[in-house]
Amino acid sequence: MEDLIKALQILLPYYYGGRWPTHCEHDIMYVCEVDVSKMDVSVVRELGKLGFMPGLGDEDYDTIKGALGEDFAMSGDYENITDEQWDKIKNDISNAFFSYRFGSN
């Protein structure tokens, strides 16, 4: 529970959205309407440590795969993403973060 609250607090300054900031579907928790393009890579790394990845999963997979390669896209290793890698994708992925950790039992 503490990691979830910490992740939501990290995302709060980037939230520009409406009434329902979260959504759960098929064992995945989404936090939507967060401006990922304004995030520093250190924020993305911290969220990665807490179990969150940028984008909308399958919807952004091809974009990430095209920019960073299939190995990175499959690994979801956002704890160790570099500045250069983040700069390649941050303007082309959905304004959301998702987690398998908090979306399933």
Per-segment meaning from a language model:
Residues 1-105:
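Acidic interaction surfaces
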